[in-house]
A protein has these predicted regions:
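Class I S-adenosyl-L-methionine-dependent methyltransferase catalytic core
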Residues: 2-223
Length: 223
């Protein structure tokens, strides 16, 4: 059938472990979906604030980045490295800069990606990415702090300052892809930024999602 041919799967009535859902509404809307089920407890497999691997994959897919080419991608809030890992798997030939201000996380990423020639790990403040030249990055894709765990961080100020720095390092027409639950703060920062404010009227500017049960949004912007 369609699912078997499209996804190269075999039917297993005893419990194949994969679920496909087809849902319809009375207003005519229909959706065909794959359920990304994880049987193990996520508390045991993920650190606090770590982005789940399947969500990181969806995030990267939504960014619509080329699968091949000598592009430069940056995750300035790389944390545990979920996004850089997916980028290295989905985009062959690119160079990925995974940076974070936390020295401990940077050390763990350096070990995790040891031997991965595509990923370069740096310790850096996302508002001062001094290792990048102006107009040198094709896409910044990141999951910055939302303010849930980092109570000492001024989130509105952080978002404003990071957008200024992203504007500096991105090439003309470069992409900015952000995941955040602090939606009001980010949208206000975009509104106040001369370069990125034009994006707020685009139909794909904002996509609402749930991350571990929390409301968030994925934002797609261009310089």
């Amino acid at each position: 059938n369609f699912i078997q041919k499209t996804f190269s799967l075999q039917n297993d009535r005893t419990g194949g472990g994969k679920e496909f859902w087809f849902m319809t509404r009375t207003d005519g809307f229909a959706a065909f979906a794959y359920r990304m089920t994880q049987k193990q407890s996520t508390e045991k497999r993920f650190e606090q604030g770590e982005l789940r691997s399947e969500f990181a994959l969806m995030f990267v897919k939504m960014a619509q980045l080329p699968h091949k080419g000598k592009f430069v991608y940056a995750d300035p809030f790389a944390g545990h490295g979920s996004i850089p890992k997916v980028l290295s798997e989905e985009c062959s030939g690119c160079t990925i800069y995974a940076s974070d201000i936390d020295n401990d996380l940077v050390g763990k990423m350096a070990q995790k990606f040891n031997g991965n020639r595509m990923i370069r790990v740096r310790q850096s403040d996302a508002t001062n990415l001094s290792f990048f030249k102006d107009n040198s990055v094709d896409c910044v894709i990141s999951d910055p702090p939302w303010g849930d765990f980092e109570k000492e961080i001024d989130i509105p100020l952080l978002y404003k300052k990071m957008l200024v720095e992203f504007d500096r390092i991105l090439k003309d027409e470069g992409k900015l892809c952000i995941l955040t639950g602090a939606k009001n703060h980010f949208e206000q920062a975009v509104k106040e930024n001369k370069t990125f404010s034009k994006n707020s009227q685009n139909p794909d500017f904002k996509t609402d999602v749930l991350v571990n049960g929390k409301k968030a949004s994925i934002y797609l912007l261009k310089k």
